Amino acid sequence: SNDSAEAGSSGDSEILGKLAGSLNTILDYAGSDLDTVTSFRQHVHAYKLLSDRASQDQDVALLRRQLTEEFYLLYSLLFTQTLEQPNIPMPVKMFLYFGYVDEELAGLKNAVTLYRMAEAMSDHSDIGVYTFYDWLMAIFRGKKSPSRNEFDQDYSDYIHKQKVGGNITDAELKALENNPMAKVNYELRNMFPQVNKITFGRITTFCPLFCADDVLKDLESSYVTVSRVSQILEEIRRIDYTAFYRESLDMEHIDVMGKETIHLEYLPDIILMPNVGIRGVMWQEIEGKRRNSPGRMVFSIFHLEDLKTTFTHLTGEFRWELCKRVQGNRWNDVSISSLTSEYFDYIQFYRKNHDLSTEAKEKVKSSLQRAKNSFKEMFVRDYMIWVLFEGAGSPRLNKVARQIMFTYCPFPEDICNTLAQNPLYSELLDRRKIKVAQGLHHLDVLTRKLQNGNIPVPETVEQERYYISGSKKS
């Protein structure tokens, strides 16, 4: 409560008392694996004594590598212990949430802040925001499946490949299929080390231990909270309102709806890595092979950059990757209209495009150089301009890019009404009006057909009206 915060230093010193010797508390709780524990303790001690922990000297780089390997072993040990000893000491919680190992390494003021944050932490997985510990718990409980590995194999691909390769027997395969801890370990082995490092952002000096040197911004202001995530997701969806929809058949009302396509929204799962970092990662656009499942986006739990900008970047990546996934190997075949095929065609042949001025062509050329010739990166940058600027009424894109964006990432009705004053959009808006009218007419016909047959109209039809028009009342 706020009373304790008001008490300030007396409360702080009480917390510091509880945090004294955090490393011992953590290692005692971890229990059995004495070699790892002893070695980790020595390495942490050596790391604390360094004057420059980011040094590129060989011995320092080696120490960081050893600490990194041991940290992940320890994370696995501690996770397993929490299943058996539910009374988790606060330093252990701080380790699992934030990568905290030692009050002096963290800086005493930071340690107190982390303590208060860990104390107030609750499980938010029901609304799709996970600390990494809660993410592993969701996998352990079978609510989520492990992420794909670097060879794009999900857990079941992987164990079947092991069986085919003769590494495991049929009985072992069966056991692994339903072994929750094996699934957790798959995530710990494949996803965690990679993504923890990428989100941290400074790859060459990476070390997963929470350290005062990495806190380049006040912890409270960089803390990624559920309310910040929800607010930003809401802001993006107010502009690109169809970002997280998937085309689908209405399986729940298949007898009534038949082959009628509908669109369902799957908001991404947000996973927060135990570090202070600068990058977000769009880790998966779908779960395993199921298209109708949430994507996975990952941030540092303390994100030093502007969260909305990073989030918008990831949403652009998500749109690109999902379109590629849905289109398969025809993702860049322009005879089949899609976001990726039209954008690919635009960048590939921009020099010959009569709709672009010489100046616009020059801009594309220099942007492409800056994006190291990556079409995806070009798209993501245009997407960010679309959401952050054009959606706010400030045109920045060229005519061709704007048309592609308007077609595949349309604005909702209220923004379209605002843009109607601007002649740059008039042709696009006219075309959209026709398309929306056709879509709504189709749904009207469907609705009347159902009503005439005394069949209740599924609520998915109402939702589809919103998908088509971007209007809550159409």
Language-model segment annotations:
Residues N2-D3, G8-R65:
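Sequence-structural signature of the catalytic-core scaffold of metal-dependent phosphohydrolases
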Residues A20, F40, A46-D52, R64, ...:
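Active-site-flanking segments in enzyme catalytic domains
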